[in-house]
Amino acid sequence: CCKYGWTCLLGCSPCGC
């Protein structure tokens, strides 16, 4: 998953952000 805390990391697959 691309989530890190409350944010989404760039360059990752979407994970319901």
From Swiss-Prot:
UniProt KW Nucleus keyword: no
Tissue spec. comment: Expressed by the venom duct.
GO cellular component terms, semicolon-separated: extracellular region
PTM annotation: Contains 3 disulfide bonds. They are not added, since framework IV presents two different connectivities (I-V, II-III, IV-VI and I-III, II-V, IV-VI).
Subcellular location: Secreted
Organism superkingdom: Eukaryota
Annotated site (Important for binding and activity): Y4
Molecular function (Gene Ontology), one example: toxin activity
Primary residence: secreted
UniProt keyword terms in alphabetical order: Disulfide bond, Ion channel impairing toxin, Neurotoxin, Secreted, Toxin, Voltage-gated sodium channel impairing toxin
UniProt comment concerning the protein's domains: The cysteine framework is IV (CC-C-C-C-C).
General function of this protein: Mu-conotoxins block voltage-gated sodium channels (Nav). Blocks reversibly sodium channels in molluskan neurons, but has no effect on sodium currents in bovine chromaffin cells or in rat brain synaptosomes. Induces paralysis in bivalve mollusks (Mytilus). No effect are observed on fish (Gambusia) and fly larvae (Sarcophaga). PnIVB is approximately 6 times more potent than PnIVA in blockade of the sodium current in Lymnaea neurons.
Protein family: Belongs to the conotoxin M superfamily.
Name of this chain's protein: Mu-conotoxin PnIVA
